[in-house]
């Protein structure tokens, strides 16, 4: 893989992680392809979810590989209660080993989300994020100074494009239970669909955000506090912001950046809106003051 796009203080650790993923992505795909990979275990993870077999196997595989990197001090999976920490290193990884596992049995797109933090697990310390999506093809998207998209072919990641969102998109990925939506959100969604926006929600956050990114605009929303800040929300918020979009939530009717949220406990959850500028403006118009 050509690493010419990666420059600056945190480029080296991103390159190390990508190199590791490039070597291990076929093994990860093999884990997902096993006939019983989507079977549920009898366990409950720290977030209260029941993992499938592939969650646990992929988690162990990724943890071992991340810990092998000299510059990584701590590795933290959403499947674990607390981080695994080493003596040396300055970077911390928080990751969701298999986002979208609940729809994997339907053969929907799933993926691994990775957040790279410096010194502490805080939104303000997030320096880069990556995700790999697994489907009929494998893709990698990286956010550092900009957002870069790669396709996996013949054992290597090949550059596809730099992703920049347009001011206005055409797709909406609206998650959550609609009966619990606020009146403002319902009106905003009705307005979008009246303008011929297309609904593209699969139940896999990484897949839906990936769709918004590669289509160069639109909106992903999950108004209930279900998504985990460290493992899902912050990494994908950084991704959207670096692509010239907006990542936000509403606090008593006031729009605020997701990446300015505090983290009181490791598995804390948040509502989440990721959008192009136009969609963000419309949402603020309808949800302001609610």
Regions found by a protein language model. Give the residues of each.
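IMPase-like, lithium-sensitive Mg2+-dependent phosphomonoesterase catalytic core
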Residues: 1-34, 56-290
């Amino acid at each position: 893989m050509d690493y010419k796009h990666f420059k600056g203080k945190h480029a080296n650790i991103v390159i190390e992680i990508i190199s590791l993923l490039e070597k291990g992505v076929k093994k990860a795909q093999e884990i997902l392809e096993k006939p019983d990979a989507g079977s549920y275990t009898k366990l409950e993870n720290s977030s209260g979810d029941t993992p499938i077999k592939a969650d646990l196997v992929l988690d162990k595989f990724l943890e071992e590989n991340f810990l092998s990197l000299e510059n990584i001090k701590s590795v933290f999976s959403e499947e674990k209660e607390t981080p695994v920490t080493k003596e040396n290193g300055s970077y911390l990884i928080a990751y969701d080993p298999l986002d979208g596992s609940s729809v994997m049995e339907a053969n929907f797109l799933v993926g691994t989300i990775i957040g790279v933090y410096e010194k502490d697990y805080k939104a303000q310390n997030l320096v880069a994020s990556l995700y790999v999506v697994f489907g009929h093809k494998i893709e990698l998207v990286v956010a550092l100074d900009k957002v870069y998209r790669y396709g996996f072919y013949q054992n290597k990641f090949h550059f596809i494009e730099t992703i920049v969102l347009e001011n206005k998109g055409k797709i909406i990925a609206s998650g959550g239970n609609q009966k619990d939506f606020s009146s403002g959100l319902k009106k905003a969604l009705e307005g979008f669909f009246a303008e011929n926006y297309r609904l593209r929600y699969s139940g896999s956050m990484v897949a839906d955000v990936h769709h918004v990114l590669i289509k160069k605009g639109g909106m992903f929303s999950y108004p209930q506090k279900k998504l985990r800040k460290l493992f899902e929300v912050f990494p994908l918020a950084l991704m959207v912001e670096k692509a010239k979009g907006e990542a936000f939530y509403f606090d008593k009717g006031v729009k605020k950046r997701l990446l300015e949220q505090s983290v009181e406990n490791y598995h804390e959850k948040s509502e989440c809106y990721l959008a192009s500028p136009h969609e963000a403006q419309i949402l603020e118009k309808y949800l302001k003051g609610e």
